Every structure is written in structure tokens, then in C-alpha cells.
Amino acid sequence: MFSTKKSQGNLHKYIQRQSTDEFAVKAREHNYRARSAFKLIEINEKFKFLKPESTVIDIGCAPGSWLQVVVQKCPNGYASGVDLQNVLPIRGADILSLSDITDPAVKLKIREKLAHRQVDVVLSDMAPNPTGDNATDHLRLIELCRSVFRLFSVENEIELVKNGVYLCKIWDGSARAEFVRELSDRFSTVKTVKPTACRDNSAELYLFCRNFKK
């Protein structure tokens, strides 16, 4: 059985960590919904891919911190987000909540929302619910990233512009090299990045893919 005492202890540790974590504190100060906003900000500062007029879609956008950054960086563009969870509205962003990207009806809604726009940037910071087994969780996240990749590389549900960008989160593991090879077939540049906002003990990495090959 699940221990209530253990659960309360874990919650206390989480609250204590959040109260002193540099990026969690900064997120509250800047009204971002999560500390992950600073991961996107840092990656964008490095590669400068979010332009004022960019069309951006964020797959797995809950709680919305990346969309908040996109709206700020792309004031004359278009920002769209999709997530299985309910996502509270963000001024300037078009959000599809309670939506599974593998559902054909959701894919149709995405196309309708984009209204024939070509997409400059596809983002994915989503993650599966952890099983407790690192190898399994790694493979499940790679498959999620691959499913997003297929949306624009195979299925054409999203029309990524030539030279477009795909940025996705992975957890490091055995399938990373193979997935990077797949991405490299369709992008001229694939970089692995670990922003300073990632926790030191985390296996979290980001794959930044630029210059999509039509």
C-alpha cells in the first residue's frame, strides 16, 4: 500500500525545494507558470529561433510556461498549444486542452487552428507519467517525441517550413543516439543541450533541430 506518511514527506521536500530553488523563485517573480520557462528562454538566447513573427506550436504545453515565453517573444506571430490536460487560457495563445495528438479528430482541429499557416517552430516539453523505471521512462519519452516528429515529417498534419525548428525534451538513455540519427535525416543541424535550469541530478536533455529538409 501507498504510505501516507511517505507521501507527506515527499510533498514537504517538494515544497521546501520549490521555496529555495532559484528558477522556481524567478518563475514566481516573472509570473511564469513553471520554472521550465527559463529552459526555453536560455535555449532561445543560444540559438535565437523565436522571431517576432514566428508561428509556433507547443505539443504537450501544460501548464503553459513555454507558451507564455512564445507569446512574449513572438508578438506578431501565432502561438498554439495542445495538451491532454486542461490548460488555463493565456492571452495571445490558441490552446487545445484535453486533446490527444494521436486522435484523428484532434489532428483535424490542429489543422483548422493553423488555418493553412506554415509552422516555423515545433516545441515539445512533455513527458509521460513516470513508472519508476528509468529505462522504461526514457523509451516512452523518446516515443512521444517521435510521435510529434511524425506529425510534420511523415503525416504532414503540421506543415513545418523549410529550415524550420523542432525542439524536444528527452531523458538520456540507450535510444538517444538512434533518435538523433532519425532527426539528422530531416534536419541539417541537431544539437543536444542541457539548460542551467535543468536540475543537476536530472537526465533531462533537449534536442534542438534546425533547418528542416522538405
UniProtKB/Swiss-Prot annotation:
Active site, UniProt feature: 169
GO MF annotation list: rRNA (uridine-2'-O-)-methyltransferase activity
Superkingdom to which the source organism belongs: Eukaryota
Ligand binding (S-adenosyl-L-methionine): 63-66, 83, 100-101, 125
Short name of any one Pfam family annotated for the protein: FtsJ
Alphabetical UniProt keywords: Methyltransferase, Mitochondrion, rRNA processing, S-adenosyl-L-methionine, Transferase, Transit peptide
InterPro entries the UniProt entry points to: RNA_methyltr_RlmE, RNA_MeTrfase_FtsJ_dom, rRNA-MeTfrase_E, SAM-dependent_MTases_sf
Residue span of the annotated presequence: 1-18
Key word Transit peptide present: yes
Enzyme category, top tier: transferase
Keyword Transcription assigned: no
Annotated catalysed reactions: a uridine in rRNA + S-adenosyl-L-methionine = a 2'-O-methyluridine in rRNA + S-adenosyl-L-homocysteine + H(+)
Example GO BP: RNA methylation
Enzyme Commission number(s): 2.1.1.-
GO cellular component: a single term: mitochondrion
Family: Belongs to the class I-like SAM-binding methyltransferase superfamily. RNA methyltransferase RlmE family.
PANTHER family: RIBOSOMAL RNA METHYLTRANSFERASE, RRNA METHYLTRANSFERASE 2, MITOCHONDRIAL
Its biological purpose: S-adenosyl-L-methionine-dependent 2'-O-ribose methyltransferase that catalyzes the formation of 2'-O-methyluridine at position 808 (Um808) in the mitochondrial large subunit ribosomal RNA (mtLSU rRNA), a universally conserved modification in the peptidyl transferase domain of the mtLSU rRNA. This activity may require prior 2'-O-methylguanosine modification at position 809 (Gm809) by MRM3. Essential for late-stage assembly of mtLSU required for efficient translation of mitochondrial DNA encoded proteins; methyltransferase activity is not required for this function.
Name used for this protein in its record: rRNA methyltransferase 2, mitochondrial
